[in-house]
Amino acid sequence: MSINQYSSDFHYHSLMWQQQQQQQQHQNDVVEEKEALFEKPLTPSDVGKLNRLVIPKQHAERYFPLAAAAADAVEKGLLLCFEDEEGKPWRFRYSYWNSSQSYVLTKGWSRYVKEKHLDAGDVVLFHRHRSDGGRFFIGWRRRGDSSSSSDSYRHVQSNASLQYYPHAGAQAVESQRGNSKTLRLFGVNMECQLDSDWSEPSTPDGSNTYTTNHDQFHFYPQQQHYPPPYYMDISFTGDMNRTS
């Protein structure tokens, strides 16, 4: 593989890191703007063939009041719009069933259940924007789990790691401090942290030769071309000779 290909891969991973950081920041901003409204544990009928979710009466009348809507809207129902943990919009038909005297979400609910793989015992979470009272959010939590779908999404984003595994193209630079070395990789000085028990064997002619067979090095960029911190595990195969 050519040096240009390695350089392109390095740039690609750097862009991916930046995008993940932007998504993480957006997610944090959204969470800070949310105000918890209520939670609804799902019953078997909520995820069954009735294709509807029953909203507890006290929560329905407090947060989604139909009394303020027009008479025809009360009969036909309203469209309630929500955003999920990824910012995807969801629209549900919201109405009052006289037969069961209950407030329900109908159209659109079965698709949400299917996409999120919800089962009886799981919990649906409802939130509202702190400054925009007409903006609602919907999330979910698995049965017996203390973290919500939003928490899980942020956890994956914050722990997403980018790894880079070149096998060539590194050039040694005459710089060493303690058990660390500096390598120059594609024009970027990288500090290499060596294991404490690592040593370089000497040859009869006085030169130092080291052979690494999948030895692990940890590199940290010394320039600001790429967003720090940028962790890379780089494995070298083959022999590299450096003369003193």
Swiss-Prot record:
GO molecular function: DNA-binding transcription factor activity; transcription cis-regulatory region binding
Segments of the chain annotated as binding DNA: 38-144
Any single Gene Ontology cellular-component annotation: nucleus
Domain of life: Eukaryota
Subcellular location per the Swiss-Prot or TrEMBL entry: Nucleus
Name of the protein in its database record: B3 domain-containing protein At2g36080
Gene3D superfamilies cross-referenced by the UniProt entry: DNA-binding pseudobarrel domain
The entry's keywords: DNA-binding, Nucleus, Transcription, Transcription regulation
InterPro entries: B3_DNA-bd, DNA-bd_pseudobarrel_sf, LEC2-like
Primary location: nucleus
GO biological process: negative regulation of DNA-templated transcription
Pfam families, sorted: B3
